[in-house]
Amino acid sequence: MARIAGVNIPNHKHTVIGLTAIYGIGRSRAQKICEATGIPTDKKVKDLTDPDQDALRKEIEKFLVEGDLRRETTMNIKRLMDLGCYRGVRHRKGLPMRGQRTRTNARTRKGPRKAGVALKK
């Protein structure tokens, strides 16, 4: 298994697919990385030579990936919450922040349904 950016890349997969195991690298960015390094996209990870792996590491270092990207994302959300803006308030309450309806739906953000309170008669 090749270890790139602190992540073990699966051996049996093509290089493009294997690179997507790194947080912050999707299919399009993986293809651009392979083009920049001159590595064929259909080459398996186990067939990569040490210079190929070094070239991939050097190219990936140019991007914000893994822990740094996660940290930046959480800091951006924390900044919104500290500002007290609409999006920050919605993050704090655990509700959708992009204008979706919440009377029905929004179960992913709100979590499972709570039991309703019955009125005493």
Curated annotation (Swiss-Prot):
Keywords: Ribonucleoprotein, Ribosomal protein, RNA-binding, rRNA-binding, tRNA-binding. One of its GO terms (molecular function) is structural constituent of ribosome. Residues 91-121 are annotated as: Disordered. InterPro entries: Rbsml_uS13_C (IPR027437), Ribosomal_uS13 (IPR001892), Ribosomal_uS13-like_H2TH (IPR010979), Ribosomal_uS13_bac-type (IPR019980), Ribosomal_uS13_CS (IPR018269). GO terms for biological process: translation. It comes from the Bacteria. The keyword Metal-binding does not apply. The keyword Magnesium does not apply. GO terms for cellular component: cytosol; small ribosomal subunit. Located at the top of the head of the 30S subunit, it contacts several helices of the 16S rRNA. In the 70S ribosome it contacts the 23S rRNA (bridge B1a) and protein L5 of the 50S subunit (bridge B1b), connecting the 2 subunits; these bridges are implicated in subunit movement. Contacts the tRNAs in the A and P-sites. NCBIfam families: uS13_bact. Belongs to the universal ribosomal protein uS13 family. PANTHER family: 30S RIBOSOMAL PROTEIN S13/40S RIBOSOMAL PROTEIN S18 (PTHR10871), SMALL RIBOSOMAL SUBUNIT PROTEIN US13M (PTHR10871:SF1). Part of the 30S ribosomal subunit. Forms a loose heterodimer with protein S19. Forms two bridges to the 50S subunit in the 70S ribosome. This is Small ribosomal subunit protein uS13. It comes from Ralstonia pickettii (strain 12J).
